[in-house]
Amino acid sequence: MLQPKRTKHRKMFRIRHDKKDAFKGNKVSFGEYGLQATTSAWITARQIESARIAATRRMGREGQVIIRIFPHLSKTSKPIGVRMGSGKGSPEKWYSVVKRQTMMFEVSGIKPEVAKDALRLAGHKLPVKWRIVEASPKEEVI
């Protein structure tokens, strides 16, 4: 599963995923089709891995899945049955904040029908509403 190799601080503040749109990482950059979030949420490392496995199984040996989000924030929790106080709990899971219009996954090198089906299967594993976006034709600079 995805998690940072090392971080400056083990325990972090909780970041809001408010109703603002993403102004970076909201276009198809590396592939031909992309899975774009239409709502905001926290997405855990397990959910990202589950979506990646679903997409790669549908694609078979051809094509490539590009993950555009990374779970770099830690979520802490205390064990069950522990009373309040005595500090913050230990890091339990890693998550990523996904705002509206964030491009989460991209695929390249396969037929359009297979690409859309693979992204659809991956999207059903995630806790956000999503849509499939096609890459805009690149303009050649002369």
From Swiss-Prot:
UniProt entry keywords in alphabetical sequence: Ribonucleoprotein, Ribosomal protein, RNA-binding, rRNA-binding, tRNA-binding
Domain of life: Bacteria
GO molecular function: rRNA binding; structural constituent of ribosome; tRNA binding
PROSITE patterns noted in UniProt: RIBOSOMAL_L16_2
Keyword Glycoprotein applies: no
Any one Gene Ontology cellular component term annotated for this protein: cytosolic large ribosomal subunit
Family matches, as InterPro entries: Ribosomal_uL16, Ribosomal_uL16_bact-type, Ribosomal_uL16_CS, Ribosomal_uL16_dom, Ribosomal_uL16_sf
Keyword hit for tRNA-binding: yes
A Pfam match: Ribosomal_L16
GO BP: any one term: translation
Assembly, per entry: Part of the 50S ribosomal subunit.
Function comment: Binds 23S rRNA and is also seen to make contacts with the A and possibly P site tRNAs.
Entry similarity comment: Belongs to the universal ribosomal protein uL16 family.
Protein name according to UniProt: Large ribosomal subunit protein uL16
Protein's organism: Mycoplasmopsis pulmonis (strain UAB CTIP) (Mycoplasma pulmonis)
